[in-house]
Amino acid sequence: MKYASFIAAAAAALASAVSAAGVSGSAEGFAKGVTGGGSATPVYPSTTDELVSYLGDSEARVIILTKTFDFTNTEGTETSSGCAPWGTASGCQLAINKDNWCTNYEPNAPTVSSITYNKAGVLGITVNSNKSIVGQGSAGVIKGRGLRIVSGAKNVIIQNIAITDINPKYVWGGDAITLNEADLVWIDHVTTARIARQHIVLGTQADNRVTISNSLIDGRTDYSATCNGHHYWGVYLDGSNDMVTMMGNYFYYTSGRMPKVQGNTLLHAVNNYFHNIEGHAFEIGSGGYVLAEGNAFQNVDAPVESPISGQLFSAPDATTNEQCKSVFGRACQINAFGSSGSFSQADTAVISKFSGKNIATAHLAQNIPKWVMANAGQGKL
């Protein structure tokens, strides 16, 4: 009887541990309602092949990462020609001549006869629908390869992991997280660092409902397109019918595209911390509709690049911000600045685009730097 009781107690404890493993909290903003793998029994991959299999199959899954999955050498290397469009100094990125990019777009750039890079990084791991990818503590790392949520995949959660070291010297060597024709995606408490090109990119097809929250885009790098140790290729939102909430993120030590917004993208940027950006943060092209409130900018050369071809409501002052009440049910929050450039444009037509949609909460910008630095990124759930 004692043995039976022990077994029952052990089984109960195991069941409790399993049920506790998985996603923490819930998404705010446009990805509200995302469930990922839901209540599926967690799986714990132990090899890179097993991780790829779990991410790409058709089952609803909660995938717990407990270690570093290093893809750097899993597919060997490739050698090709390239170019140096941003300079030949040791701190400048080089570009792989992928799809004849150098030939077609940078014909006058110095040529590089031989570039050797890791093949695995160029194309991310396919993530199918109904997946939760969750790191355990600070242990869950995907190194040398990114993730791709594309071609109709939906209902995906990526939480508490790091994606690092994807051919950082070479543009076109790979992106950390790619979405293209996806829906209901929540990226939360994710750290990205030392990436070839985009840390997060939403391609030209529609990515309907996306929330990027509490994440760290770490731009510190030995190789940069601006040759200054600040990564240029940050977040690129270019979809044909995209709704993106960015909240509580830490954008650090970058020099551009933080984010670049165009195509037909509605962006709510709220309570983010932009810090030590030698260059520009926002870049708003045609079809980019941005409402930015309650953000903090510290040592940011240009919070937004000029000219603005899309529309921006920058929550410029208390009186103007009252106009948010008709849609948000509250006034918008003023942004905060320290040793930063100007950020003031009031395209109030942007406000009405949020009507009937899930809108994230907003807090005072003055409190954001301390809060974000304590909470954004992997290991800070």
UniProtKB/Swiss-Prot annotation:
Disulfide bonds join 83-102, 92-227, 324-332. This is Pectin lyase 1. Residues 1-20 form the signal peptide. It holds the Pfam family Pectate_lyase_4. It catalyses: Eliminative cleavage of (1->4)-alpha-D-galacturonan methyl ester to give oligosaccharides with 4-deoxy-6-O-methyl-alpha-D-galact-4-enuronosyl groups at their non-reducing ends. The gene is pel1. It is found in: Secreted. Pectinolytic enzymes consist of four classes of enzymes: pectin lyase, polygalacturonase, pectin methylesterase and rhamnogalacturonase. Among pectinolytic enzymes, pectin lyase is the most important in depolymerization of pectin, since it cleaves internal glycosidic bonds of highly methylated pectins. Its main location: secreted. Keywords: Carbohydrate metabolism, Cell wall biogenesis/degradation, Disulfide bond, Glycoprotein, Lyase, Polysaccharide degradation, Secreted, Signal. Its EC number is 4.2.2.10. One of its GO terms (biological process) is pectin catabolic process. InterPro entries: Pec_lyase, Pectin_lyas_fold, Pectin_lyase_fold/virulence, PEL. Belongs to the polysaccharide lyase 1 family. It comes from the Eukaryota. GO terms for molecular function: pectate lyase activity; pectin lyase activity. Glycans are attached at residue 130.
